[in-house]
């Protein structure tokens, strides 16, 4: 899906790591949420409350998923899931464009 229709967009950005990771929240009519964002090169760790699906829209990232011992590479067109109430780490070597879907 390259565009979303009939949604509410929160204007205020979600800003992390001194602006190196930013996103905007999109709310759908059924109440589900996604964020569309950009990550600049760096290393980041995030905690989850809800389960998430991270879809790569551009660039790439190395991901250390919860419980994993090895890093995995994800590129444009690929996605990965992160369980609720967990933590995952990212290594970004080039600008990464992503869509994060929050699962209920």
UniProtKB/Swiss-Prot annotation:
**Reaction catalysis annotation:** a purine D-ribonucleoside + phosphate = a purine nucleobase + alpha-D-ribose 1-phosphate; adenosine + phosphate = alpha-D-ribose 1-phosphate + adenine; cytidine + phosphate = cytosine + alpha-D-ribose 1-phosphate; guanosine + phosphate = alpha-D-ribose 1-phosphate + guanine
A single GO molecular-function term is: uridine phosphorylase activity
Q: What is its EC number?
A: 2.4.2.1, 2.4.2.2
Q: Does the keyword Transferase apply?
A: yes
Q: Does the keyword Ubl conjugation apply?
A: no
GO-annotated cellular components: cytosol
**Superkingdom in the source lineage:** Bacteria
Which keywords has UniProt assigned to this entry?
A: Glycosyltransferase, Transferase
The entry assigns this protein to a family as follows: Belongs to the nucleoside phosphorylase PpnP family.
What this chain does, per the entry, is described as: Catalyzes the phosphorolysis of diverse nucleosides, yielding D-ribose 1-phosphate and the respective free bases. Can use uridine, adenosine, guanosine, cytidine, thymidine, inosine and xanthosine as substrates. Also catalyzes the reverse reactions.
The protein, known as:
Pyrimidine/purine nucleoside phosphorylase
- Protein's organism: Syntrophotalea carbinolica (strain DSM 2380 / NBRC 103641 / GraBd1)
């Amino acid at each position: 899906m390259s565009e979303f229709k009939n949604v509410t967009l929160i204007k205020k950005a979600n800003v992390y790591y001194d602006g190196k990771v930013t996103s905007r929240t999109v709310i759908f009519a059924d109440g589900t949420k996604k964020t569309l964002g950009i990550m600049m090169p760096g290393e980041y760790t995030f905690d989850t409350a809800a389960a998430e699906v991270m879809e790569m829209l551009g660039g790439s990232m190395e991901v250390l998923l919860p419980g994993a011992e090895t890093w995995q590479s994800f590129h444009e067109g690929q996605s990965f899931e992160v369980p609720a109430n967990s933590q995952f780490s990212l290594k970004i070597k080039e600008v990464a464009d992503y869509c994060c879907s929050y699962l209920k």
